[in-house]
Regions:
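Glycine-rich phosphate-binding P-loop
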Residues: 75-96
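Conserved nucleotide-sensing/catalytic segment adjacent to the nucleotide-binding pocket
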Residues: 96-166
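Short metal-binding segments enriched for Cys and/or His
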Residues: 58-71
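Histidine-centered nuclease catalytic patch
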Residues: 24-55, 68, 105
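Short, charged surface segments at domain edges that flank catalytic/cofactor-binding sites
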Residues: 1-24, 40-47, 68-73
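Pre-Walker A (Motif I) flank of P-loop NTPase domains
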Residues: 72-77, 142-144
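Conserved beta-strand scaffold positions in the cores of enzyme catalytic domains, especially
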Residues: 76, 99-103, 172-174
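ATP-dependent NMP and nucleoside kinases share a basic, alpha-helical "lid"
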Residues: 110, 150-202
């Protein structure tokens, strides 16, 4: 990640054109901008031009890291829904032949075909694999079509993942399954707790 400063004359033009409020608006944003942020990251060939620069607060700039805005490199989609939601059916008509799907359930199934018997350790391993894949793909400068699939849009490192996705212009899809339909299923204790957390979010 580059640390050299932008030419003050270019920065002045950026502020005159776009203002000096943080343009990212990540969770915890301090609003007042103190740093320069590249729309196309410098590491991906982004230039110090007025068109490619915006002002950001230190917090949001650090939180973004080198993640691309959706469409400036990888195009990123997120699909979220309650336990046992039919994610595959929801995405079926939208996936391309070369789409990349990062699914917690699929990763867990690869580790433990009988998911109901998955230990906490295996669930943690699947979560770490999901995080690693999502983090790497979110920084890709290649024109990939990436679909991130999970139930709860949060993790220990990213407690408000949904707000981050929206700030980075991800295409977010919410699968709306009535609560009574979900709780009528033969859920595992883990799925039941997750379902309670999901419906407490009141996402639509």
């Amino acid at each position: 990640m580059r640390r050299q400063t932008v030419d003050p004359r270019i920065r002045a033009k950026v502020i005159a054109t776009y203002g000096n409020r943080c343009w990212l608006g990540m969770p915890g944003c301090s609003i007042t901008a103190t740093e320069d942020d590249h729309i196309v990251p410098y590491s991906h060939g982004g230039r110090d031009t007025v068109a490619n620069l915006r002002r950001a607060c230190k917090h949001c700039n650090a939180m973004r890291q080198d993640r691309v805005l959706s469409g400036y490199g990888a195009t990123l989609h997120a699909v979220i829904g309650p336990p046992r939601a039919d994610f595959g059916m929801a995405m079926q008509s939208m996936l391309r032949r070369d789409s990349i799907v990062v699914s917690f359930d699929s990763l867990l199934r690869d580790l433990c075909p009988t998911q109901s018997k998955a230990t906490d350790g295996l669930r943690l391993a699947a979560a770490m694999a999901w995080d690693g894949a999502a983090r790497t793909l979110a920084k890709s400068s290649e024109p990939l079509d990436v679909w991130l699939v999970r139930t709860l849009p949060r993790s220990r490192r990213h407690p408000d993942m949904l707000a981050e996705w929206l700030a980075l212009d991800y295409d977010v899809h919410v699968i709306e399954t009535p609560a009574d339909s979900t709780f009528a299923l033969d859920l595992t204790p883990q799925e039941y707790r997750t379902a309670q957390q999901w419906y407490a979010l009141h996402l639509t």
